[in-house]
């Protein structure tokens, strides 16, 4: 369903190691919004919920709710760092268009 690059796995592991809240994975949710129609919402989570797809890769879990699953099927998640920014990058084959910021799609 979702592929994580080694960089994304390392970033998720780092985030999990820094949180004070109990968490063992990353939740990816697609919500209405952004300049192209949909946006990604990311957050750490401690458990799966009814209907979730649970993807395990490199020792981390990714939770995707049932409503978001069709929007992220086949997506690759990467993490990049630059001189002045760092963040997750989404290569989503379901996106017909992306906004300039790369966080919103339609």
Swiss-Prot record:
Gene3D superfamilies (UniProt xref): HesB-like domain
Lineage top rank: taxon: Bacteria
A Gene Ontology BP annotation from the UniProt entry: iron-sulfur cluster assembly
Alphabetical list of SUPFAM superfamilies matching this protein: HesB-like domain (SSF89360)
InterPro entries assigned to the protein according to its UniProt record, in alphabetical order: FeS_biogenesis, FeS_cluster_insertion, FeS_cluster_insertion_CS, HesB-like_dom_sf
Keywords: Plasmid
Coiled-coil annotated residue ranges, if any: none
Gene Ontology MF terms in the entry: 2 iron, 2 sulfur cluster binding; 4 iron, 4 sulfur cluster binding; iron ion binding
Similarity comment: family membership: Belongs to the HesB/IscA family.
PANTHER family: IRON-SULFUR CLUSTER ASSEMBLY 2 HOMOLOG, MITOCHONDRIAL
Annotated protein name in UniProt: Uncharacterized protein y4vC
Organism from which the protein derives: Sinorhizobium fredii (strain NBRC 101917 / NGR234)
Lineage: Bacteria, Pseudomonadati, Pseudomonadota, Alphaproteobacteria, Hyphomicrobiales
């Amino acid at each position: 369903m979702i592929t994580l690059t080694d960089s994304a796995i390392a970033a998720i592991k780092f985030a999990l190691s820094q949180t004070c809240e109990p968490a063992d994975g990353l939740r990816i949710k697609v919500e209405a919004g952004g300049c192209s129609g949909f946006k990604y919402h990311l957050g750490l989570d401690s458990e799966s919920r009814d209907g979730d797809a649970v993807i395990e890769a490199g020792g981390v879990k990714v939770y995707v709710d049932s409503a978001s699953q069709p929007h992220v099927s086949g997506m690759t998640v990467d993490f990049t760092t630059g001189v002045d920014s760092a963040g997750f990058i989404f290569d989503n084959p379901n996106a017909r268009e992306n906004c300039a910021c790369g966080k919103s799609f339609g």
